């Protein structure tokens, strides 16, 4: 697709040749014609990177015949819809920070990082509606962040001009987004993008790129892939991350070609040893790659004739969730191992995404990557001082604000996505039961993990003393508002999965206890158990409300909820909703009447 640029604020004396010469002098040669009008002109660039370079180099910076020219994307009003481009983003900015910033102005359907040779980052953002994109344009234009000023443009939204295929969701129908599909797509049409990320020695980066980029262009052309070499990340590092986007076959072929280039370069520079293949993989997927008692890894080693090692868990942090899988062997052997390793990682990733999407149907608008709860949804721009300086796996996975989830399950009067704009929500206490052997993983070394988790969630998290020497479960006491409960419980479920406390193919199911006023227990059960049965059918959680339980000193009884994370969360919220309704009725009606109505 051509990138049409608008050149404005031109003097009447400017000619097409003037513009060609100016662009040429700035090493921005124009291949096509210059369409010159009175006071403005249009030019085309076939490549988005060249278009960005022209905007950044010329707009507001270059004078021609006494006037400072303006350069931007040429987007007709008809195509100014949901898509914007943000430039001049600090290169070290973490995705979570950008998440939060973008989410303030609406539901973000997609963010894709543009692979440019500029020092700063560029992203293309798609909002759910035209109005949200317009607000983001107005609010973020010129936004200052650490001495960087954001530059924002509309980019064409092809969805507006193209006719809608029959299967496309109509305006107002959010089903395609809720299922994680691109707008207008189907589950078959959209393949999950799971890139291969590898580390290459810095001294081989030049050889992989080649003179004037010819080698890397040849790789991408032959394999139909996109290869991002993050050579500007973490200057001085011994290794640089490379991200390869393609089909599984294209990814493996591109990886093989890169391995061959590195080995050839090593041979020519008299480096004796074989160059290992180093694959970066999220810790949440690595357990399933290894397999029970290491069987999967041993099988790959045996079949490919390689030696495979995986970096220590101690290298991980909440901001650096990746581990390094080092494969040693011949180029052919390493390439074969890469195919098998990626097959396992991709399968684990797709299973996780399937589970997320199935449960997210219960929770409209939910996307976990916005909260960073589950491993496979987590994409970050690494901190500048990270151990590997690894950049994000682009294109950035679609994410939305979590306001859709909270607005559907939490009453609006409690809080919005930004609690400081509202009255403080009520503190809730949830007791979550985890396997005894998982306590160390939740606490972390010298309590580091549990403190980090409490800060992230904005909750108080304590592990109750064991009730006896041989108990199989321990109680985690979580105190905080609804959003904090969601984050804290989600991270605990995710941690248990990552650390292999449950079988790779097994869902993490935990028991949670919440206390409700004894006077509302009957309402939670419903007539003949109707309400609790409906609740279980809706949420897939097991909900147990003991009828003969003696209330505690606060006249409260315990409701037990057993299920996976989404099931448990939905059940907790629905039960709280019932309790809230009863409280409102008690405030509305005299005491005697309220109790009669609740029976």
From Swiss-Prot:
| Chief location category | nucleus
User: Positions modified as Phosphoserine?
Assistant: 11, 162, 164
Q: Per the record, what about its domains?
A: Domains KH3 and KH4 are the major RNA-binding modules, although KH1 and KH2 may also contribute. The contribution to RNA-binding of individual KH domains may be target-specific. KH1 and KH2, and possibly KH3 and KH4, promote the formation of higher ordered protein-RNA complexes, which may be essential for IGF2BP1 cytoplasmic retention. KH domains are required for RNA-dependent homo- and heterooligomerization and for localization to stress granules.
**Per the database record, which ranges form the KH domain?**
193-258, 274-341, 427-492, 509-575
The segment annotated Disordered runs over 157-188
Residues that the record marks as modified (Phosphothreonine) are 550
Q: What is this protein called?
A: Insulin-like growth factor 2 mRNA-binding protein 2
State its location(s): Nucleus; Cytoplasm; Cytoplasm, P-body; Cytoplasm, Stress granule
According to the entry, what is the taxonomic lineage of the organism? Eukaryota, Metazoa, Chordata, Craniata, Vertebrata
Q: Which SUPFAM superfamilies match?
A: Eukaryotic type KH-domain (KH-domain type I) (SSF54791), RNA-binding domain, RBD (SSF54928)
An example of a Gene Ontology cellular component annotation for this protein is:
P-body
GO biological process terms on file: anatomical structure morphogenesis; cold-induced thermogenesis; CRD-mediated mRNA stabilization; energy homeostasis; mRNA transport; negative regulation of translation; nervous system development; regulation of cytokine production
Q: Which UniProt keywords apply?
A: Acetylation, Cytoplasm, mRNA transport, Nucleus, Phosphoprotein, Repeat, RNA-binding, Translation regulation, Transport
- Tell me which residues make up the RRM domain: 3-76, 82-157
Q: Where is the composition biased (Basic and acidic residues)?
A: 170-180
